[in-house]
Amino acid sequence: MARKGNPISVRLDLNRSSDPSRFSDYYYGKSLYQDVNLRSYFSSIRPPTRLTFGFRLGRCIILHFPKRTFIHFFLPRRPLRLKRRDKSRPGKDKGRWWAFGKVGPIGCLHSSEGTEEERNEVRGRGAGKRVESIDREKQNEIRIWPKKMQRYGYHDRTPSRKKNFSKSLRVSGAFKHPKYAGVVNDIAFLIENDDSFIKTKLFKFFFLPKKSRSDGPTSHLLKRTLPAVRPSLNYSVMQYFFNTKNKMHFDPVVVLNHFVAPGVAEPSTMGGAKGGSLDKRIRSRIAFFVESSTSDKKCLARAKKRLIHFIRQANDLRFAGTTKTTISLFPFFGATFFFSRDGVGVYNNPFYEYAREQLLGQLRIKCRNLMGKDKVMELIEKFIDLGRIGKLIKGIEMMIEIILRKRRIPYGYNSYLNEVQKMRSFLSNRTNTNTLIESVKIKSVYQSASLIAQDISFQLRNNPISFRSIFSKIVKDIPLIMPKGVEGIRICCSGRLGGAEIARTECGKYGKTSCNVFNQKIDYAPAEVSTRDGISGVKVRISYSQNKKGRAISETYEI
């Protein structure tokens, strides 16, 4: 008899060496309860009103893995111009700017067009009121628990508000083990017990990204791959590492890929690294792509050479007079600072303190001359003061990676970093876990299988479209990105597709998608959608090349 192979969700890198009980249905109810609390919690943060845009949860995807949980927020952009609107009845939503952020497929994040049902669902005059169109689907809606028991104010603004939540929320069941059962529940209770948590500036800044320009050939690829995706689509990824027993005492990393090149932030430098490999890894990161206002390549090369010289001096003084210790990584608008842990490696020799002070001053001057912006230096000094380095320079080690590709530094960015640090420590302390908050810029939809799976589910929900047309739209531009690391894609849809009387399964494959090789890099994501004809399921598998280092965004990598 043939040996039954392990499911693909078990063979993912994130799920290996895990407890088999995670994949059982024993803890299914508790996992669903925690998912609902998470969605309720994030949707209740700064709800939109008639006067304020608020935090519009365009789409929230929760992916559970045995060792971590990904929470993907798809954030609609604020309109460029908010036109004056006359006083009218709240029922008339025509031309109103708050209707544009209606939850829908990825394309709805950038378009006000939608179905008649979506256009009829608008916000009322009150912050907590909603005017909804009544149709058959909403009349037959079954609540998870009675209305009186909704103590968390569950009013999910996401499309998955029906009885059957997407299986992508529970693909591997990280919380099915009793060991991790209460972690997400603690996060859900934060909104109820701590009013200061709601008032943080993190969500005001973080969840309302301004329009950013996307350069490079990938912008054209995005426009043609999925009609829904735009090059400036932003979403945040919040990862909770469930090290409840052995909590590591380091500040989690904040990765801002809008300004930092991919691969700059690597938490692998933390702890246990050998001296030679650590030096090699750090020296490999000494790469500068400084673009000043001038277009003269010779001047740029000279400035780059001088700056590298000072950085190498900082690297040589990094471990002077101390032993090599664990470091923490703090990216800052494209400038990456390395500081030793507080209280480790105190320099008693005044010579080293004076040398570091002189070197820090020279670095400030060089950065000011290269960037030509006083605002940059003010933010750098505030950031250094924030890290308590201004008074006591204990174990300071400094390397700078500057990625300024003619991009403006957003207003209030230093305040954003402060709020990120507060949120990080707050969640880490209250939940007894290591929290990593990231902001990821989508450059290619093929970075994540969950993006494609969710978009297909929306297309099946809104329109009775055939599987062939969906598949052809997705795979038509795959040959353009194959040199970047994508080998192939496999998509399967099951259900009464197109209103068929008998349910069937249709699959499409393009390129190489081997599911039987353990060392194959595969990103897998399922999705479930409720249609008029029943429940349909979607499975997407994307395979990446072994040689060209193509990886999925679910692993915090970038194609």
From Swiss-Prot:
The Swiss-Prot or TrEMBL record describes its family as follows: Belongs to the universal ribosomal protein uS3 family.
Put simply, this protein is called Small ribosomal subunit protein uS3m
Whether Methyltransferase counts among this entry's keywords is no
Question: Which PANTHER family does its entry note?
Answer: RIBOSOMAL PROTEIN S3, MITOCHONDRIAL, SMALL RIBOSOMAL SUBUNIT PROTEIN US3M
Q: Basic and acidic residues bias located where?
A: 120-134
Q: What's the superkingdom here?
A: Eukaryota
Gene Ontology cellular-component terms for this entry are: mitochondrion; ribonucleoprotein complex; ribosome
- List, in alphabetical order, the GO biological process terms annotated in this UniProt record: translation
Query: Which keywords has UniProt assigned to this entry?
Result: Mitochondrion, Ribonucleoprotein, Ribosomal protein
- GO terms, molecular function: RNA binding; structural constituent of ribosome
Q: Where in the cell is it found?
A: Mitochondrion
| InterPro entries, per database record | KH_sf_prok-type, Ribosomal_S3_C_sf, Ribosomal_uS3_C, Ribosomal_uS3_CS, Ribosomal_uS3m_plant
Q: Where is this region: Disordered?
A: 113-134
Does this UniProt record's set of keywords contain Zinc? Answer: no
